[in-house]
Amino acid sequence: MLCNLIHNIHKEGYIIIMISFLLSCIGFAISCSLGIIFLVASLLCIYFFRDPIRIVPEGDHLIISPADGIILNIEQVNSPIDNSTQVLCISIFLNVLNVHVNRIPVSGTIKATEYIPGRFISASLNKSSELNERQRIVIESNVNHHTIIVDQIAGLIARRIVCNAYEGQNVNSGERFGIIRFGSRVNIYLPLNIHISAFKGQTVIGGETILAYLEDYPHKQLTAKFI
């Protein structure tokens, strides 16, 4: 049971959880109430860094949500890597209770990664997409070689973005590629000429919810995998 619990915690949380449990032990040695406070903090850290297995729909034509959260906006904007190109931006806000592990939205190849320094205003504000610290990955999809861009955006509390993707990497939809700590935002930029199934206000699950289709799909039988 303990092994399963550890397996379902993201490695970025190991040190924080160990420190919080150590503090709870010290706290109990001082007073019961102090120990309980640190123990509760430890349990909250375990909850925050949880990394559950997801049932990922299979298909190179699928665009899967890269994060848990709620869709704040779906709007046409200039591409963040090419101002002359219009794309569709889906913005997903993650509160502190959401799973913060990020997943690859589409099968393909990582063409570029980029760290962009910035501020730490609330990730629920639209201007955070341009002003806040963020980490970007650019994916070329296996289907029709579309360019898909994902921005991990830091928030007011989230000041640690982890991205394990690297240029030239072949990736499959649903695979884990990073995490953002304590409340944040993920923007995904898609080409205009695809079928969008997501909608504003929708609650999405990273690695499970289908946001869009790169080609006509309706009569295709979907299968799934556990990741």
Swiss-Prot record:
The keyword Lyase applies. It holds the Pfam family PS_Dcarbxylase. The active site is at 184 (schiff-base intermediate with substrate). It is a peripheral membrane protein. Coiled coil: none annotated. The record marks 183-184 as: Cleavage (non-hydrolytic). Keywords: Cell membrane, Decarboxylase, Lipid biosynthesis, Lipid metabolism, Lyase, Membrane, Phospholipid biosynthesis, Phospholipid metabolism, Pyruvate, Zymogen. It catalyses: a 1,2-diacyl-sn-glycero-3-phospho-L-serine + H(+) = a 1,2-diacyl-sn-glycero-3-phosphoethanolamine + CO2. Its cofactor is pyruvate. PANTHER family: ARCHAETIDYLSERINE DECARBOXYLASE PROENZYME-RELATED. Catalyzes the formation of phosphatidylethanolamine (PtdEtn) from phosphatidylserine (PtdSer). This is Phosphatidylserine decarboxylase proenzyme. It comes from Ehrlichia ruminantium (strain Welgevonden). The gene is psd.
